[in-house]
Every structure is written in C-alpha cells, then in structure tokens.
Amino acid sequence: ADFSRCMKNGSPAEFYYCETNPMNTINSVVREDFNLGIVRFQSSYEKYFSDLFKDKKLTSDTIAEFSYSMIISKNDPLAHKDSVCLDDLADYIEVCHSDPYVPSVPAIDVRKSELTEFVERRIFVYERGTQFVLLGNVPETFMWVSPVPQQLLDSYGLVQLKVRGAERLYKDVLIYRRD
C-alpha cells in the first residue's frame, strides 16, 4: 500500500491492484487495460520471459530478486526449531498459489519446479488473505513466499523461516509498454 502515498490531494489518480498469473499481467499491459504490471517468475525462466517481453514490445525492469522463505503458524513446532530442512515438511500440507503458470512450458514441468516434490497434501488458494488465514488456523500447513513484512506476519500469527535445501531464486519484474 506504499504506492498510495504517491496519490496527492487534488490530483486525479486511480490504482488497480490485482493478483493474477504472469500471462494475464502481460496481456493486460499489452491490451492497454493497465499501464504497468509486475510479473514474478523463477529465475530459471528468465530467458523465456525476456524474449516474451521483447516480442510483446514491453520494457522490463527488475525490481526485486529473492529466494522464497517458508511461512507457518507461530504455534507450529517447526517455528521453534533452530534449523528447518525440507525433510521436516514431509507430513505437512503445502498451501499453494493456485496458478503457477508459464506459457509454452508444459504444466507438469511448471508444477514440478514450483511445488515441493515430496509433499503429498496441498491446498490451492488464489487469494493471499485466505492463504494467510489458512496458515494461521490449520495445523501443519506451510507456504513458500517472497519476503513478508513483520507487521503482516504478526497480524496472522505467522513466522517466516529459511529452509535448508530450498534456495530457488525468483524475480519480480516491472513491465510497461515501450510507446
């Protein structure tokens, strides 16, 4: 919500905040539904997205690079361990964003690269607030996330942890039309 500070009294402004998949974001900017978009992707797909942005005549600027952390309930036993590794999550339920999508890459390959391979139980949820409510209230759930502000974690009773063996790199890229 920091962007709302840019809205000055007496100056007209409208912001639309929508969570969606990368292709919907790209198409919305190309169709001029929106002037800007932010696309998140795993760094291993960077060439694909760079070529796509070029093909769609979009300019892109990296605004963040990060590794996902895990969030869980502050009351979960893992929240109090000195060190957490991937094996600790085997009996847990993974809360996942419901649309891990990379166009022209087979869906099975995207799922393999985005989902924790040895976890057998998942809840797919699109909306961030619902994800956080589930994590705070359903025992033995976890989710991979970009860095989350402490105030938001506190609001939902969550903690953010680094997990050994989970070092996938991601990028958030601002896109806009070249014209």
Language model feature labels by segment:
Residues 2-5, 45-47, 86-115:
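Secondary-structure junction motif
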Residues 1, 40-42, 74, 97-101, ...:
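Structural motif
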Residues 20-25, 29-35, 39-40, 99-160:
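Hydrophobic hinge/microswitch elements
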